[in-house]
A protein has these predicted regions:
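Conserved catalytic core of nucleotide polymerization and phosphodiester-bond processing enzymes
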Residues: 1-150
């Protein structure tokens, strides 16, 4: 979903890496941390973690002040490493002022805090796609077949 929303700002770069490379390794190389660390940081960042939580996602043992500083440093490096992300975040901040996000299907998702906007947008849109996929597959299946959506 992030690739979809970044595309207008990065000319499809993120999507190309997702489909032809390893986005986590690419980001790790650009930020200067391990692939495992960047995966943890990515999800903390996308789910709206504050600087302390972001810093502790990198190193669980950091005291609060050090975690806040590390989180701020990681946030800055992460945004700088992904072309178009700063612009997407600014658009999210601007749109969050209306109190809702438009999911991929145009449906309104209520957003109570600006830092949650991107997370709500990504997860709401992903849920819409998953639900449509299940309906489509269900229509193609034999009547006695069963279907279950499992998030991995």
């Amino acid at each position: 979903m992030l690739a979809h929303y970044l595309a207008r700002y990065d000319e499809g770069r993120y999507a190309r890496i997702l489909t032809t490379g390893d986005i986590h390794q690419t980001n790790a190389d650009r930020i200067g941390i391990t692939r495992r660390q960047v995966k943890t940081v990515t999800y903390a960042f996308l789910y709206g973690a504050g600087n302390i939580k972001l810093g502790r996602s990198f190193d669980k043992l950091l005291p609060e002040e050090a975690a806040a500083q590390k989180g701020a440093d990681i946030r800055k490096a992460y945004v700088a490493a992904i072309p178009g992300l700063a612009e997407l975040l600014q658009a999210c901040k601007t749109r969050s002022e209306r109190g809702y996000a438009n999911a991929i299907d145009g449906r309104r998702i209520s957003v109570d805090k600006g830092h949650k906007f991107l997370n709500y947008l990504l997860q709401g849109s992903a849920a819409t796609i998953a639900k449509r996929w299940m309906v489509t597959i269900n229509q193609c299946m034999p009547a006695d077949a069963h279907l279950s959506l499992i998030h991995i």
